[in-house]
Amino acid sequence: MFSRIFNYVLLLIAVAFALSGAVATLAQKGKQHPSFEVLTHRMDVDVDGAPNAYGPPGTQTLDILLNAHYLNRADNEIVGYLIDEQKRPIPQGPKDPFPGYYISQTAFTDIENQNQRDPRKYVDARNINYVVRGNAARRRGVRVGDFASVFSKRTRMGVFAIVGDTGNPTGDEGSLHLLRDLGYPFLDGKTDSVDQPEIVIRFYPNSNPKHQFFFTQSELNEAAMKLGLSRDFSSAPIAYR
């Protein structure tokens, strides 16, 4: 009789632990990071950060030199690659990925890499999904390096990304890898673009306070999922899906 009671008590304890664990799990899943969504007017391809983005005339690059200027105007400052005090392009060294090409930069950088002239310090547009922070996102507290989810209303695909660059007040730009990951067959930043308002960005303000840097998209995806972020847009407002 005593053994039955003892076993029954053990069973109750086990059930209680199981229920408490389930409740804790549900509570954790219920904690969603604050976010908001923006429908872009268009989306141009940004190749900044790629080591072969810009180079001397005659080299095979992902973009034209004009696009390295702010707002793509020749009379504006150069923001797409590093220049010296005489405003001359700083070339990559012999041990860099593309020797002789210009060092293309992004606003988000690897803070553990103190070498400003190392192309690896910047977000490679060929390998990482990133969006450009526009004025609207900045006013709502989005920081460079924060996570985002991006959805194409045309291809019906959703992916994780980070806020990797600035420089376009509209925010209507995304990395080459981002557009390709969304299903667009783009090759470079010279002429490729999404001309319709069909790309939706979900921003997660202050979601990367430690400025974690990523060298592969799989690392970025893993970090986003650990935070409980979502690339599912099925429950978004009708205008965003």
Q: Language-model segments: what does each one mean?
A:
Residues L26-M157, A161-G164, D181-G189, V194-I199, ...:
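Cell wall/extracellular polymer interaction/catalysis modules
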Residues A22, N168, N206:
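Residue-level marker of positions within ordered structural domains that often coincide
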